[in-house]
């Protein structure tokens, strides 16, 4: 069958035409990290189109450095009265690292606080006609198809009603490796096409091999279809976006010829467990303060968070091709946390990267439990620590390097905090058990007294707590000032109760997460790869025995730290109790925060409520309704046996199989592919062949038309020759 004949067949088989449009190949070469590519950075189209204001940098970064210098000086003064010991020098160094980390967030929070006090500017581009084309990409990996396809359905329908639907195409880019989910995706795609083909162009592709994970998935699309589009709007499997946000991003990109990437700040929604609702509330009340402040001072050197952002295709394909790092994982191989790196490379090429902190209507979901958060953070931790290999990249803007460093510190801060706690504990135990050395080896008429300035230490403690909790305080002040905002979360009293509850529960969870991150860092330094596991999205509950196993070291660490503290005094134990209680109760805290029932209880009494929960956007309501409908549509999933048995079903399936050419003759064959070939060749019937396949092999067969045709030619069941002769 010729290519043209194949296209006609697909058009007849699938409602709305072929599963994917015709390819328009384009180059997306891996970028050099050791030298600046020729022609970079590009000359901006608009004068000062990619230039940022130095004054904003001076206020935030300079303010953070000045605040850190003051705190470090004060800490040194606390120790310096009687001379600084080696252990005190260590504590001073650890304090400096940790304080610099929180000082930057605090100063960003100040900027965000004052920006949010202003009235938002009207959208001057709202009526702008779109003459550019945007591909909206929804990558998915072993996710629930009802969630993914229903979200695309409602977003596509809403966008079609704006009058701008002609400027957008929708793509579900699957990297699914589970054969059952892959067949469910095909069923869901047929339903989606049936619903949307009259008003939207929606496509589906499942890769045979998920090389380089999500980054490789998007790069594969770019190399084969990217040249058809001016922009790429990248979503995640749990993303939702209002139509005004989608068109707003495209209008901003169209209006700014120097914009390479525009990132929204997503709001968290659909949390059902206590842990998810805790994250939702914190992100909604405190998140805008940090996000707005960050967007204000980074300006044209913003960041990319992997989804809910629009990217100029020319900038992405021309500047953000990711190289493989030398060596093996976890520090070598494919770049895992690709988003920060892609933003840095786009900015290096002379395009601006902007955080659209003033654009609402962007949504995502969050992990439902501490364990699920730990699984996700293990992967992110490896990707962020891998950025230590990216930091020396030639030509990166210093703000881009700071973004990379911030990502690294998001996980290294936990070991540094733990070391700070242990050092302080050692100083207390040293003072309690070890006789001071009043006269050192150097001759002196006066003794060296191991004393500290307790008043200054207490004052510094209050300053540190103020810096640490500053962004939370700013968020609460904004909430209390805005009556509409306060009413949207249940009123000021409920809001204050929610804040108090969030602070207490977060304080209990923080030491658990500290040890989880410490364990992740240690396992990465020991050379262990994270793998790629699909995320749980809804229920976070687990058996208690599983939780005991997961948190056994956290509880043991809490007992050991408590024992060490009580060796000194009950006062020290009391000071450490906020951290220790969380560790001692790690298992019940993990169980309760991952419970949907407990989450629903707090929802009923109005604690940790958000505006999006109490008054959800129409797109969120429709997505929930559509998801239930999709669940009903695909409640009876196809099987490979049914596909082989039913010729019409086979044609439908083949119409949705990726048309990328199979392995060329003479090229190396992968072991799993060779095994499948042998099993298909030796099988006497379809039933025996299917019984031999494992899940990986079955997924490979589903993506290989030649193997499917070979299996289809086999009899459904084996009939012995003597029985045939007898009949």
Swiss-Prot record:
It is found in: Cell inner membrane. Its EC number is 2.4.1.-. Its main location: membrane. Gene3D superfamilies: Spore Coat Polysaccharide Biosynthesis Protein SpsA, Chain A. Keywords: Cell inner membrane, Cell membrane, Glycosyltransferase, Membrane, Transferase, Transmembrane, Transmembrane helix. The keyword Membrane applies. It comes from the Bacteria. Residues 18-43 are annotated as: Disordered. One of its GO terms (biological process) is glucan biosynthetic process. Pathway: Glycan metabolism; osmoregulated periplasmic glucan (OPG) biosynthesis. SUPFAM superfamilies: Nucleotide-diphospho-sugar transferases. GO terms for cellular component: plasma membrane. Pfam families: Glyco_trans_2_3. It is a multi-pass membrane protein. One of its GO terms (molecular function) is hexosyltransferase activity. The chain crosses the membrane at residues 58-78, 94-114, 278-298, 408-428, 460-480, 496-516, 572-592. Belongs to the glycosyltransferase 2 family. OpgH subfamily. Involved in the biosynthesis of osmoregulated periplasmic glucans (OPGs). PANTHER family: CELLULOSE SYNTHASE CATALYTIC SUBUNIT A [UDP-FORMING], GLUCANS BIOSYNTHESIS GLUCOSYLTRANSFERASE H. NCBIfam families: PRK05454.1-3, PRK05454.2-1, PRK05454.2-5. This is Glucans biosynthesis glucosyltransferase H. It comes from Shewanella sp. (strain ANA-3). The gene is opgH.
